[in-house]
Amino acid sequence: MSFVYKAYEVDIRRSDPSEPPLTISNTEELVAGIKEYYNGLDREVILSCVMDDANRLLGIYEVAKGATGNVEFAFATALRPAVLMGATKVILVHNHPSGDIAPSDQDVQMAKGMFICASMLDMESLDSIIIAGSSYGSVHSHPEFQRWVENDLAAIAQAFTGDGYLTE
């Protein structure tokens, strides 16, 4: 008796491999390219946009679908395509069907966790973007995220030595 077991399977392909990957210069370009995806959705959906060092878009992957007011996911699920594609940068994008682009406390916590997890994999979490109708906003620009980067994250970074091991 034999069987095949797949731990996970991810189908990664480009529609036309002969075309060079799109280079993302700013948030507006990324939002313009994907906001149509969110039109008419009545629940929150998270996308992971993965890029290389030159900001070439390697792919956009659906991470999770949630309810009308929230969505849950595992950071490993969001980062798996980036790891498999050899990406060095990632941007999370999700929608707010309510039309309010203000980040919730959960949105800020998600952005913090993604920032740390991506860093541990030698990747850069460039932003976490919220799209609501024709508007969008950056969680990384939110005052609570900024305070965390300036204060708490600096303290975490000081706990690490140059060789990456925690010190006492």
For each feature predicted by the language model, list its residue ranges.
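N-terminal beta-strand/alpha-helix entry module and adjacent surface
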Residues: 1-87, 106-124, 132-168
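Short beta-strands and strand-loop turn motifs
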Residues: 90-96
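Conserved beta-strand edge residues that scaffold enzyme active sites
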Residues: 96, 130-132
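Short, solvent-exposed loop/turn segments at secondary-structure junctions
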Residues: 98-102
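Beta-strand-loop-alpha "switch" segments that mediate conformational coupling across diverse proteins
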Residues: 127
